[in-house]
């Protein structure tokens, strides 16, 4: 797992541990994640953020984007208003 997702994952785990789903109803984290209706809005937002983070880690087009090559023919032409000596 990438380091950038680790913090979000820890925050999500902490949120789940302190939610009524796990703390009061004594359900497992897996059960709470399946029934998102029982979770507070903060946990739901962290679930979405964690999923987005994982998707970005796998999306190679966003990880290594190379700038398009410039057309060198246009760059080497002399401007028409320059006098040749």
From Swiss-Prot:
Protein family membership: Belongs to the PET191 family.
Family annotation (InterPro entries): Cyt_c_oxidase_assmbl_Pet191
Keywords of this entry: Disulfide bond, Mitochondrion
Disulfide bond positions: 21-53, 32-43
Residue ranges, annotated region (Disordered): 65-85
Motif Cx9C motif: positions: 43-53
Primary localization class, coarse: mitochondrion
Location of the motif Cx10C motif: 21-32
Domain (CHCH): residue spans on this chain: 18-61
GO BP term (any one): mitochondrial cytochrome c oxidase assembly
GO terms under cellular component: mitochondrial intermembrane space; mitochondrion
Top-level taxon of the source organism: Eukaryota
Localization in the cell: Mitochondrion
The protein's name: Mitochondrial protein pet191 homolog
UniProt keyword Isomerase, yes or no: no
Protein function: Involved in the assembly of cytochrome c oxidase.
């Amino acid at each position: 797992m990438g380091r950038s997702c680790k913090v979000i994952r820890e925050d999500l785990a902490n949120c789940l541990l302190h939610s009524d789903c796990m703390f009061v109803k004594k359900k497992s984290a897996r059960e709470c994640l399946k029934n998102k209706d029982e979770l507070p809005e903060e946990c739901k937002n962290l679930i979405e953020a964690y999923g987005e983070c994982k998707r970005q880690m796998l999306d190679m087009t966003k990880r290594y984007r190379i700038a398009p090559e410039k057309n060198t023919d246009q760059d080497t032409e002399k401007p028409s208003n320059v006098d040749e000596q």
